[in-house]
Swiss-Prot record:
Residue ranges that the Swiss-Prot or TrEMBL entry lists as coiled coil: 134-164
Compartments where located: Endoplasmic reticulum membrane
Broad class of the protein's primary localization: endoplasmic reticulum
UniProt keyword annotation of Transmembrane present: yes
A Pfam family hit: EMP24_GP25L
Function: Eca and bai are essential, though not redundant, for dorsoventral patterning of the embryo. Specifically required during early embryogenesis for the activity of maternal tkv, while the zygotic tkv is not affected. Involved in Golgi organization.
All residue ranges annotated as the GOLD domain in the record: 30-126
Protein name (Swiss-Prot/TrEMBL): Transmembrane emp24 domain-containing protein eca
Keyword terms of this UniProt record: Coiled coil, Developmental protein, Endoplasmic reticulum, Membrane, Signal, Transmembrane, Transmembrane helix
Top-level taxon: Eukaryota
Signal peptide, first to last residue: 1-20
Family to which this protein belongs: Belongs to the EMP24/GP25L family.
Lineage: Eukaryota, Metazoa, Ecdysozoa, Arthropoda, Hexapoda
Length: 216
């Protein structure tokens, strides 16, 4: 019982954690990130673009002419979202298939900003972390206890989705392993048949050679 409680606590701590980072890109550069998402899970992407200022040797808030083209593809390589956003914003989408979702970003800057160095701040929130509970409490007029219960219910739901996703991955891995083992078996059988045929042909050829030389 204690081990189960510890495992549940660890899962709650690591489940769908937020990912905050920043990276540098040029005008034509494209950056992609892979996020493993269960099905029917909300993902929120917060971003902010800054433009390098050579006079101050630092990054400043970008001008309105610079935005970001954001493209999201699911595990079936289908486009979930693809559009141009402003230099700072919040993007939200819901996964409909479990698996790796690829989030790609690149600048839509014009020739005026060609070659400019950009810094992009990125924060990806998955699952319960994508829910603004303060806003939920205000809209639904929840008490502190009701809000806490709501959070726990959402956590349990996310754990269930994560467990289903892990079972999906295990099933897919098992199917891949069985397919690989089957191919290895058939390849081994094919090699055995080829070797037997070659041995039979060599024996026939050797027998014909001995008969031609009247050695047998």
């Amino acid at each position: 019982m204690r081990d189960q409680f510890i495992s549940l606590a660890l899962m709650l701590c690591i489940l769908h954690s937020a990912c905050g980072l920043y990276f540098h890109i040029s005008e034509t550069e494209r950056k992609c990130f892979i996020e493993e998402v269960p099905d029917e899970t909300t993902v929120i992407v917060n971003y902010k673009v800054e433009l390098y200022d050579p006079r101050s040797n630092g990054f400043m808030p970008s001008s309105p002419g610079i935005g970001m083209h954001v493209e999201v593809r699911d595990s079936d390589d289908k486009i979930v979202l693809s559009r141009v956003y402003s230099s700072q914003g919040r993007i939200s989408f819901t996964s409909h298939t479990p698996g790796e979702h690829v989030i790609c970003m690149y600048s839509n800057s014009t020739a005026w900003f060609s070659g400019a160095q950009l810094r992009v701040h990125l924060d990806i929130q998955v699952g319960e972390h994508a829910i603004d509970y303060a806003n939920v409490a205000q809209k639904e007029k929840l008490t502190e206890l009701q809000l806490r219960i709501r959070q726990l219910l959402d956590q349990v739901e996310q754990i269930t989705k994560e467990q289903n996703y892990q079972r999906y991955r295990e099933e897919r891995f098992r199917h891949t392993s069985e397919s690989t083992n089957s191919r290895v078996l058939w390849w081994s059988l094919a090699q055995t048949v080829v070797l037997v045929c070659m041995g039979f042909w060599q024996m026939r050829h050797l027998k014909s050679f001995f008969e031609a030389k009247k050695l047998v």
